[in-house]
Regions:
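TPR/TPR-like (Sel1-like) alpha-helical repeat modules
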Residues: 172, 195-226
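Structural marker of alpha-solenoid helical repeat scaffolds
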Residues: 105, 139, 173, 190, ...
Length: 251
């Protein structure tokens, strides 16, 4: 709040115009905190997990200039965050150097391994991506994003059959992830499982809230699976589609 007042120039920030005396308010809060028992005041908090989530959010979604300033440190998470931001800005060489530095600093950190592997997957270095993502999965059995990109890497390297169990694992954890359903559908289509492919394209459209595409893929899935071994999978889709259709029609 103080920073806003310092940066405002001649104009008064809207917040301060309705909430004056920020300094007094801060002093009041500090006085109240000092009245707490020592056990509470001196309590230690492990915020390492929070910092890791914060790094991923800033790296993936934050304003790039502000994020790079935030990641000015030399620790592994800062280097990883810088790599994520530089990758978004298409500074591939600088991003690769940042990820390499992060890996040197934390070679056994599954988060660093996953984000570095994802970066190399996106820039087309499948061999490097495979090794990094495999290590990330071994170190963190619950990292479903690492599994998702590992499955996509298998697809890209002509091993779609091997990718199938990874997609199903991810979808058990995040059953409404539209991008996972879409990638899985394309993988299924590449190995000739057309009926299931249309089913998952329909799921992708449903969870993307794309009514027009959902209707189209639902009809195609129905036609392909009506008298096949995939009819049970279609019945599950049918229930989901009908429920979502009711919501769309009530709007």
């Amino acid at each position: 709040m103080r920073q806003k007042s310092w940066m405002a120039g001649a104009s008064v920030p809207a917040y301060l115009s309705t909430h004056p005396d920020i300094g007094d308010r801060i002093n009041g809060i500090q006085a109240r905190l000092s009245s707490f028992p020592a056990a509470i005041r001196n309590r230690s908090f492990d915020n390492r997990r929070f910092k890791r989530v914060q790094t991923v959010l800033w790296g993936r979604y934050g304003d790039s200039q502000a994020a790079l300033q935030r990641f000015s440190g030399k620790d592994a998470l800062s280097c990883m965050g810088s790599g994520m931001v530089l990758s978004r800005r298409n500074n591939v060489r600088e991003a690769a150097a940042a990820f390499d530095q992060a890996l040197q600093l934390a070679p056994k950190d599954p988060l660093v391994l996953r984000e570095a592997g994802t970066f190399h997957y996106r820039k087309g270095d499948m061999a490097r991506a495979e090794g990094l993502l495999r290590q990330a999965m071994q170190l963190d059995k619950n990292d479903f994003m690492a599994r998702f990109f590992y499955a996509r890497m298998l697809d890209e390297t002509g091993r779609a059959q091997q990718a199938q169990p990874y997609y199903t694992e991810v979808l058990r954890a995040v059953p409404e992830a539209a991008d996972v359903h879409e990638a899985y559908a394309r993988s299924l289509g590449s190995i000739g499982k057309t009926g299931l492919a249309y089913i998952h394209m329909a799921y992708s459209a449903i969870y993307s809230n794309n009514r027009k595409l959902a209707e189209r893929y639902f009809k195609q899935a129905k036609a392909k699976t009506e008298k096949s071994a995939d009819s049970a999978a279609f019945r599950k889709l049918d229930a989901v589609y009908k429920e979502r259709k009711e919501i769309w029609e009530d709007r």
